[in-house]
Amino acid sequence: MKLNYKRTIFVGFAFFLICSFWQAYDNTIPLILTNKFGMSQAWSGVIMALDNVLALFMLPLFGAISDKHRGKRGRRTPFIVVGTLIAAVMLIALSFVDSAQLRHLSDVSAIDDPAALEQIYDRQAGETLLTPSGDKFVLSQKFTQEEFIRIRSQVEQDGKTVTNPDYTNYVVPARQACAWDATAKSPATLVFFIVLLLIVLVSMAVFRSPAVAPVSYTHLTLPT
């Protein structure tokens, strides 16, 4: 057997695009959902699992559709091009929605800003919150306002700069609670974000199945 180098490079590039997309998706979307919209880890996980649920139906569907497609551009190319373009445009659109949500959090979003920390404390002082490990706490019972405002995201420990556990365990959940309050007051931004996210997932399904379908059949050719 002789390797079809051109076909192998094209198929490898398709896999590279898919892997790059999912790396960006898996590293970015959960942070937006929890930090900007204030969603819990549980609900963020549900949304992040949608791609696997949709893949069960979408990948076989678009694979079968591309198998039956006939056109001047071939069976796979239109799906690959259209799916990639739509996914790229929708990812850019998601960044604009993210920026719109950030404007709702402008008074509490700054890191290590005393004014932002004061706003967070005033809004969440009496609320019952959860640390990342799931422990409940009431902010006003843990810190006075002055103590809370002095918390910084990083501290010096044994000559090294490390993440402050008080910031991770108490400031971050309090800020996320403020983000959820803002989302509850203006849910349209979250709804629009989820709709765009679904479009991204569907467009990637349009691209993924046709892109990898040829790999089993055409990356090797018999010598003549």
Regions inferred by a protein language model and the residue ranges of each:
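Helix-loop boundary and gating motifs at the non-cytosolic
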Residues: 2-52
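Residue-level signal for conserved functional micro-sites within the alpha-helical transmembrane segments
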Residues: 22, 55, 59, 204
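Central cavity-lining transmembrane alpha-helices of secondary-active solute carriers
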Residues: 46-64
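Cytoplasmic membrane-interface "Motif A"-like loop-to-helix N-cap segments
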Residues: 68-83
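MFS 12-TM fold signature
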Residues: 84-90
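Hydrophobic core of transmembrane alpha-helices in multi-pass small-molecule transporters
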Residues: 104-115, 173-206
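Intracellular juxtamembrane helix-capping segments at the cytosolic ends
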Residues: 206-217
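Conserved small/polar residues in nucleotide/adenosyl-binding loops
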Residues: 218-224
